[in-house]
């Protein structure tokens, strides 16, 4: 069965975290919030002051290879401070590199979290992200597309909080049956 990791750090955007979380929960696909930070209690303070406890810390996972044995989807949300932490953490970078090489593994990045493609050294791809990071992505050799969601091989990127539901649904579409996807889509009352 598919299992999802949703990375989280202090400063992560609440909407970009909550949308994919809710979508995978509705689909009854196991999902963990994996904290990247130093708080031993895994208490995360999001970008707009929402606080939550993550399921586990990345420090509990010995290596990117062990991570790949436990998870099939790695999601990297944005939020200025959170995205900076996630995109500069060697463990997250290694996970992204490992997942990119493996079949049946998916990487999702949204908003400023898309900078992780650059810091992880992923090959130049078509990508989207928050307009504020467009220049940095283009400087890294990526072709920025002004679209809500971009699917390029096993990398799915999205622009920001306003596109978070579409982002979560695109990730779900890759791993769920058509019936399951349609049931979740309908349950969300999407326009």
From Swiss-Prot:
Effect the entry attributes to changing residue 16 to A: Nearly completely abolishes enzymatic activity
Protein localization: Cytoplasm; Nucleus
Catalyzed reaction equations: methylglyoxal + H2O = (R)-lactate + H(+)
Main enzyme class: lyase
Active-site residues, record numbering mapped to chain: 16, 111, 130
A GO molecular-function annotation: glyoxalase III activity
Entry EC no(s): 4.2.1.130
Record's keyword terms, sorted: Cytoplasm, Lyase, Nucleus, Stress response
Pfam families xrefs: DJ-1_PfpI
Gene Ontology cellular component list: cytoplasm; cytosol; mitochondrion; nucleus
Reported function: Catalyzes the conversion of methylglyoxal (MG) to D-lactate in a single glutathione (GSH)-independent step. May play a role in detoxifying endogenously produced glyoxals. Involved in protection against reactive oxygen species (ROS).
Protein name per its UniProtKB record: Glutathione-independent glyoxalase DJ-1
Organism (species): Schizosaccharomyces pombe (strain 972 / ATCC 24843)
């Amino acid at each position: 069965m598919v299992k999802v990791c949703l990375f989280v750090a202090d400063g992560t955007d609440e909407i970009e975290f909550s949308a994919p979380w809710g979508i995978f929960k509705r689909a009854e696909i196991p999902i963990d919030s994996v904290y990247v930070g130093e708080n031993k209690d895994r208490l995360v303070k999001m970008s707009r002051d929402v606080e939550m406890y993550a399921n586990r810390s990345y420090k509990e996972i010995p290596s990117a290879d062990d991570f790949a044995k436990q998870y099939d989807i790695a999601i990297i949300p944005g939020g200025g401070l959170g995205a900076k932490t996630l995109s500069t953490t060697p463990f997250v970078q290694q996970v992204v590199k490992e997942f990119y090489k493996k079949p049946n593994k998916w990487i999702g990045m949204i908003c400023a979290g898309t900078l992780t493609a650059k810091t992880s050294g992923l090959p130049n791809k078509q990508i989207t992200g928050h307009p504020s990071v467009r220049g940095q992505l283009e400087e890294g050799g990526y072709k920025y597309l002004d679209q809500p969601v971009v699917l390029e091989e096993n990398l799915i990127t999205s622009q920001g909080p306003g596109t978070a539901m579409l982002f979560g649904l695109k990730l779900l579409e890759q791993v769920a049956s058509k019936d399951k996807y349609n049931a979740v889509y309908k349950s969300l009352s999407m326009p």
